[in-house]
Amino acid sequence: MKKKISSRVVLAVVLLATTLALAAPNPPKANAPQNVPSFPGTLVNARYVYVTSYDGDEFNINLLSEDRQAIVTVQDAMQKWGKFTLVYEPGQADIVLMVMSRPSEDVLAVYDAHGWPRNEYLWRMMGHGGLQQGEAPLVTNLEKAFDLATAK
């Protein structure tokens, strides 16, 4: 009788341990930023970047001040990062970064300049407060994604 009970206890413990092991979430990869899409490999050799807004460039008089500030913030971040040379004409660019800043959410998208504006974005992130002056987490995520793409 005692042997029957102890074998049931052992079986129950093994089943419980197996269930817990299978149900446990996988730990995140050490090098992958969470929720950051991978940067397109076709653009890792790009050198020139143009920054604009979905509603027009920074010199458009109808552009919202938030979008104008987002353009300047991204331009400053690109210059500090130093991976790309900033250009002020879309025809000179390899990559076009498009921004939109709204109270509810900011957007940063990467386009191949050779198909822009007809083509779809190749990389995009959105987030509340993602393109604020002085701190641009969306640009930081772009840098991380680019660095991971070039490290391969």
Functional labels for PLM-detected ranges:
Residues 2-12:
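Bacterial N-terminal signal peptides that target proteins for export
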Residues 45, 88-93, 113-116:
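A short, structured loop/turn motif at beta-sheet edges
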Residues 1, 14-15, 27:
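Compositionally biased, low-complexity segments enriched in small residues
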Residues 22-80, 116, 122-130, 145-152:
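A structural "domain/chain start" motif
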